[in-house]
From Swiss-Prot:
Zn(2+) 1 binds at H69, H109, E145. Its EC number is 3.1.21.2. Pfam families: AP_endonuc_2 (PF01261). This is Probable endonuclease 4. Endonuclease IV plays a role in DNA repair. It cleaves phosphodiester bonds at apurinic or apyrimidinic (AP) sites, generating a 3'-hydroxyl group and a 5'-terminal sugar phosphate.
């Protein structure tokens, strides 16, 4: 079964994320459990936790269908010790919040070397950051997102993801989330079914589908191989509809959150309905 949804707002309370997901007929959703542009957040109250769990139960969302995202400020590969420690503490807090909410996944951008250390050193720092967080939490899997490779961000090559996983001690609690826009911008073609087959054959060989714990389904305003992260609505960008139809018809993408971060929330319900309709072999544009 495909779990299909969007990254919805949790404004007004975390329980509202589940309510908003249900309103667009989503069978999955993503959310921030705190303000994504601030370091600190008030601890979760018992009331907030209970209301969130109740809303998820009411609308039939299990932890397998929910892909929370951490703060954009966190850089687990930071070259400066003090800043690295700050990011690690914030990441542990994000993991603990997921643990309290009964969530089993935490999606995050791996990190940036800021032109101050080597890629290898940065990737090793990211892996060690994950090890520290896993040691201090239980039941939550760290889900590394591939990036477009803007600036000094790592994670734009499948080899980067594999290197991080290789450095994580508890392989049962690490995974990846593949963002289609990021992959396309990083040079992984998805414009035709044949290119999708090739790209995901590379993924299977280098990383492995056993580590795929989520997807971000985004078309791209950015051009192929541009290393620029600009999302677009499905079928309106440079990837086109075929990739998303191909994903919907491949059972390797079953049982994980497939999350829209497309640019027009007003049509998320339509995009979700379209994706659901592509699951049959006879589906057409």
């Amino acid at each position: 079964m495909k779990y299909i949804g969007a990254h919805v707002s949790a404004a007004g309370g975390l329980a509202n994320a589940a309510i908003r997901a249900a309103e667009i007929d989503a069978t999955a959703f993503a959310l921030f459990t705190k303000n994504q542009r601030q370091w600190r957040a008030a601890p979760l109250t018992t009331q907030t936790i209970d209301e969130f769990k109740a809303a998820c139960e009411k609308y039939h969302y299990t932890s397998a269908q929910i892909l929370p995202h951490d703060s954009y400020l966190i850089n687990l590969g930071h070259p400066v010790t003090e800043a690295l420690e700050k990011s690690r503490d914030a990441f542990i807090d994000e993991m603990q919040r997921c643990e309290q909410l009964g969530l089993s996944l935490l999606n995050f951008h791996p990190g940036s070397h800021l032109m101050q250390i080597s890629e290898e050193d940065c990737l090793a720092r990211i892996a060690e950051s994950i090890n520290i967080a896993l040691d201090k939490t239980q039941g939550v899997t760290a889900v590394i997102e591939n990036t477009a490779g803007q600036g000094s961000n790592l994670g734009f090559k499948f080899e980067h993801l594999a290197a991080i996983i290789d450095g994580v001690e508890d392989k049962s609690r690490v995974g990846v989330c593949i963002d289609t826009c990021h992959a396309f911008a990083a040079g992984y073609d998805l414009r035709t079914p044949a290119e999708c087959e090739k790209t995901f054959a590379d993924f299977a060989r280098i990383v492995g589908f056993k580590y795929l714990r989520g997807m971000h389904l985004n078309d791209a305003k950015s051009t192929f191989g541009s290393r620029v992260d600009r999302h677009h609505s499905l079928g309106e960008g440079n990837i086109g509809h075929d990739a998303f139809r191909w994903i919907m018809q491949d059972d390797r993408f079953d049982g994980i959150p497939l999350i829209l971060e497309t640019i027009n929330p007003d049509i998320w319900a339509e995009e979700i309905a379209w994706l659901k309709a592509q699951q049959t072999e006879k589906a057409v544009a």
